[in-house]
């Protein structure tokens, strides 16, 4: 029998237990909004059925949508959208019951936001139920919100210690890292992607509005790829802010057996049963020293990466997706031994187990206190085994020539939850009911 506090039964009344006086006042204020939500529940449910009669048959990108329900979450294999945001949260829930309430509420909101519909109206004397930044109609706009959990969620707070994924750990410092504690880790990570920044921001504000007693933002970063790359639906490799294609060597999404092996946790992985269908997510905020890089000779840039800057082809080859044959270049005369692509993937039988799926975005934040441009890469990758993939590859990359131009400053390791089967289930259900 379904728990009637779940997503099928509308919004939740916040719990006063273990809440500070200031937060209690905030929650009481939210109670007015919750009441309006309950009164308008039927209308809200109807609005969730996203209809677009005025644009039927057109190519209006605002009506593009990704499926919310399925074996795996969207946003991992989904072709990269143009806009992206990474948001790490601390969980304010104090027990397992309230944690379940959080994930049911997240499921409800994400199912609505990724489907779209008309924003419900309320009495003008009450806070509006929607920010309004998308207008009266909430378009799906190709939105995906991928939910992952961090190592800290498996501490003693919720009794989940015995259910932690085997390879999940707190991100530690590599030799070239200069980690800012305020940009690291988190209990919950949301990767929010859509066609436009407005949709990404709207989704974040909706989630924060509905979870004031359950989540607190720890850090966030916004990213982008070119509109051309996004519209290509994965056929055009994005170019990073160093001017090189980023993600050329990704495994092909169309190769399902390979993707199942590289990305998704399987039944025979020895992981907790609930984790099957999930994936290890690595997030790294990597700042680029672009002024220094822009004064570096082209030949040196290309030997650092091991690729032609224009075509993306491995040095000595013609096309981006040509595979380098290192056996024919044993001394690194064509592609240097310490080139980024050669260290990251030596292309031996043994190193095929180290593959991962990258899904990175560029970021630009203005200038530093010293007047230098603050921009770089939001590196995101997914793999079925954190130790075998990212950690092993990063160990090979330690000391590479590229380190002179890049500086990792934040991020974390997370576990991307399996998908939600249907409307009768919720995110993290197999974990929380294990």
Swiss-Prot record:
Keyword Transmembrane in annotation: no
Manner of cofactor binding, per the entry note: Binds 1 heme b (iron(II)-protoporphyrin IX) group non-covalently per subunit.
Binding site for heme b: 247-249, 340, 345-347, 358
Family annotation (PROSITE patterns): DYP_PEROXIDASE (PS51404), TAT (PS51318)
InterPro entries in the record: Dimeric_a/b-barrel, Dyp_perox_C, Dyp_perox_N, Dyp_peroxidase, EfeB/EfeN, TAT_signal
Catalytic activity field: heme b + 2 H(+) = protoporphyrin IX + Fe(2+)
EC number annotated for this UniProt entry: 4.98.1.1, 1.11.1.-
Superkingdom assignment: Bacteria
One Pfam family, short name: Dyp_perox_C
GO BP terms, alphabetized: iron import into cell
The record's account of how the chain is modified after translation: Predicted to be exported by the Tat system. The position of the signal peptide cleavage has not been experimentally proven.
Signal peptide: 1-45
Cofactor: heme b
Keyword Metal-binding applies: yes
Keyword set, alphabetical order: Heme, Iron, Lyase, Metal-binding, Oxidoreductase, Periplasm, Peroxidase, Signal
A molecular function (GO) term: peroxidase activity
Compartment annotation: Periplasm
Annotated GO CC locations: cytosol; periplasmic space
Family designation: Belongs to the DyP-type peroxidase family. EfeB subfamily.
SUBUNIT field: Homodimer. Part of a ferrous iron transporter composed of EfeU, EfeO and EfeB.
Function text: Involved in the recovery of exogenous heme iron. Extracts iron from heme while preserving the protoporphyrin ring intact.
Protein name: Deferrochelatase
Annotated source species: Yersinia pseudotuberculosis serotype I (strain IP32953)
Gene field: efeB
């Amino acid at each position: 029998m379904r728990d009637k506090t779940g997503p099928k039964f509308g919004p939740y009344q916040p719990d006063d237990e273990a809440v500070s006086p200031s937060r209690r006042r905030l929650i009481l204020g939210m109670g007015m909004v919750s009441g309006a939500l309950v009164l308008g529940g039927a209308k809200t449910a109807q609005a969730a059925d996203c209809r677009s009669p005025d644009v039927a048959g057109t190519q209006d990108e605002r009506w593009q949508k990704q499926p919310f329900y399925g074996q795996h979450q969207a946003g991992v294999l989904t072709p990269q959208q143009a806009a992206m945001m990474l948001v790490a949260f601390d969980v304010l829930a104090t027990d397992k019951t309230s944690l379940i309430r959080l994930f049911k509420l997240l499921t409800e909101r994400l199912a609505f936001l990724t489907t779209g519909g008309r924003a419900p109206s309320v009495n003008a004397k009450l806070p509006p139920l929607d920010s309004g930044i998308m207008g009266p109609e909430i378009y799906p706009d190709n939105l995906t919100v991928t939910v992952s959990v961090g190592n800290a969620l498996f501490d003693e707070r919720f009794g989940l210690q015995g259910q932690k994924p085997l390879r999940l750990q707190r991100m530690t410092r590599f030799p070239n890292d200069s980690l800012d504690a305020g940009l690291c880790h988190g209990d919950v990570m949301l990767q929010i992607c859509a066609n436009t920044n407005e949709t990404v921001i709207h989704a974040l504000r909706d989630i924060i509005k509905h979870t004031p007693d359950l989540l607190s933002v720890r850090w966030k970063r916004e990213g982008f790829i070119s509109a051309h790359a996004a519209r290509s639906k994965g056929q055009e490799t994005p170019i990073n802010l160093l001017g090189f294609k980023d993600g050329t060597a990704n495994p092909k999404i169309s190769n399902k057996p390979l993707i199942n092996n590289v990305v998704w946790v399987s039944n025979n992985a020895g992981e907790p049963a609930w984790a099957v269908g999930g994936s290890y997510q690595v997030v790294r905020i990597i700042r680029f020293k672009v002024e220094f890089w822009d004064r570096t000779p082209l030949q040196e840039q290309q030997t650092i990466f091991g690729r032609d800057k224009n075509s993306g082809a491995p040095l000595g080859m013609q096309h981006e997706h040509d595979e380098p044959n290192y056996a024919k270049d044993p001394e690194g005369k064509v592609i240097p031994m310490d080139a980024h692509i050669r260290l990251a993937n030596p292309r031996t039988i043994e190193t095929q187990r180290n593959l991962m799926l990258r899904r990175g975005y560029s970021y630009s934040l203005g200038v530093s206190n010293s007047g230098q441009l603050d921009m770089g890469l939001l590196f995101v990758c997914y793999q079925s085994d954190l130790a075998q993939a990212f950690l092993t590859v990063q160990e090979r990359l330690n000391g590479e020539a590229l380190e002179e131009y890049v500086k990792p400053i934040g991020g974390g390791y997370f576990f991307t939850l399996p998908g939600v089967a249907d409307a009768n289930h919720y995110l993290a259900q197999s974990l929380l009911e294990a």
